[in-house]
Design a protein with these regions (language model features):
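ATP-dependent carboxylate activation and anion-phosphoryl transfer catalytic cores
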Residues: 20-23, 33-34, 39-255
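Glycine- and Gly-Pro-enriched alpha-helical subdomains that act as flexible
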Residues: 251, 256-283
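Active-site rim loops that border cofactor/substrate pockets in soluble metabolic enzymes
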Residues: 257, 294-301
Length: 301
């Protein structure tokens, strides 16, 4: 797990954050949708976020976690029966980096960049966790992969919002199967094989946002959920599946026009290859002052 701590006052929150090291993820306990969840990069921001989080929390308790920058987030849904048999229904790789709420991030099933060794490690970990907590039915686990190291972010012994997407992707009614398992039936009597079969298509879930309906809404995604729906794209090729998901969500991908770029200093080098590709495709680049200066220094106008 990432380094973490629990607090119920601002003073202790600051101590924990400085011990862990910035940036940190701060959130109230027992809330859904990432409400009042924020990423703090210094003491000033942390104080403000801590006071807000304590107001939202039912018992003033707030959780402080090390924020894993530039990590890949992974969702896993499984079913476990009373005999300890486990069926890993789906391993989903998020397209947005860890730190974007899982309900807002697009994801692919199967993963598009995670190697088989890491997938095997994920299956091993989630199986052990489900056995340790003795879950009967569905369990969702959220993990992060950074520098080839896996971290467990969250374990939910319940159905997740990804269940309908996983069911459509693998062609099994996993909610119905989980309900029967909770009633005492065995997985081996409900599923032909507990081994995960190789999927013939990439299935991409994309979120739908209401930004065009509400003026003044912050468009920047973060730990607090903003989406109001989801769609999926299916294709034998990952990129084609992703494009289909974008079109389904109402994002018609342009082939010409302007692209607005604005990014913090720590991520500017990661922006450069993207900006070069956009320029090669004849898009006009528009940027904030700092980003513009960076692009001009790298011979991009």
């Amino acid at each position: 797990q990432p380094s973490n701590g629990v607090s119920n006052n601002t003073k202790d929150t600051l101590k924990i954050a400085n011990k862990i090291g910035y940036p940190v993820l701060i959130r109230p306990s027992y809330v859904l949708g990432g409400r009042a969840m924020e990423i703090a990069y210094d003491d000033k921001a942390l104080k403000f976020f801590a006071e807000t989080a304590m107001q939202v929390s039912t018992n003033n308790t707030i959780l402080i976690d090390q924020y894993l920058e530039n990590a890949t987030e992974i969702d896993v849904d499984l079913i476990r029966d009373r005999d300890g048999q486990v069926f890993v229904a789906g391993i989903m790789e998020h397209i947005e980096e860890a730190g974007i709420h899982s309900g807002d991030s697009a994801c692919s099933l199967p993963p598009f960049s995670i190697n088989a060794e890491v997938e095997d490690q994920i299956i091993n970990w989630v199986t052990k966790i489900s056995n340790k907590i003795d879950v009967i039915g569905l369990m969702n686990t959220q993990l992060a992969l950074k520098d080839n190291q896996l971290y467990v972010l969250e374990v939910n012994p319940r159905a997740s919002r990804t269940v309908p997407f996983v069911a459509k992707s693998i062609g099994l009614p996993i909610a119905k199967i989980a309900a029967k398992v909770m009633s005492g039936e065995k997985l081996t009597n409900l599923i032909p094989s507990l081994e995960r079969k190789k999927l013939e298509t990439f299935n991409v879930k994309e979120s739908v946002f209401p930004f065009n309906k509400f003026d003044g809404v912050d468009l920047i995604l973060g730990p607090e959920m903003k989406s109001t729906g989801e769609v999926m794209g299916i294709d034998k090729n990952f990129l084609s599946a992703y494009i289909k998901s974008q079109i389904a969500s109402g994002n018609n991908l342009p082939i010409r026009g302007n692209v607005f770029l604005s990014i913090d200093d720590s991520n500017k080098n990661r922006l450069l290859p993207i900006a070069k590709k956009l320029k090669k495709l004849n898009f006009k680049l528009i940027a904030t002052k700092g980003t513009r200066n960076f692009l001009q220094k790298n011979k991009l106008d």
